[in-house]
Amino acid sequence: TIALFTALSCSALSCVNAKMDTYAKHVDTRIGTGGHGHVFVGANVPFGMVQLGPTSVPQEWDWTSGYHASDSTVIGFSHTHLSGTGIGDLFDITVMPVVGKSVYERGKVGQPETGLWSYADRSKEISIPGYYSVPLTRYGILAELTATDRVGLHRYTFPKSEEAAIVLDLENGGCWDKAEDTHIEVVDGNSIRGWRHSKGWA
């Protein structure tokens, strides 16, 4: 009886997982990213605390989610985004992988030398439920993101270089979001801690 129950349980779970996988394939995560949709693109789970995805250089109304279909600039990957609101906020803790010397500023569109931002190769962008990846053309880096209920996970594949680095940007957010107090410290060889207090719409 126990063996039969186990077999039936496994079969039932397999059916549920198969259905979930099938439904996820139909999700278009880019709906609402053009026009005035203000929709965030990136990695998250339903009702999760993290919305991990790219944040762009422009701070105009159509970019309040940090992403717009017409633009491929990336200043980094922020852990929190508002989606569909039409007003920007959050963008807390932006992470940007870099190679070589960079100006540690947001920069201006069309002028990469003014900041650390990169163009993203949107032709190779992957955005599916729970996973996001895109190549950063300036640095030759592949960025991959995923998320759990409370944590954003990053994986960066760098080219061979002695000048590879990861920038933790506590200053630059997005539209309406302004950092008021920030702090970061190195705890040990594997840990950092800090905070970012910002003022925005919400």
Report each predicted region and the residues it spans.
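Accessory carbohydrate-recognition regions in carbohydrate-active enzymes
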Residues: 18-202
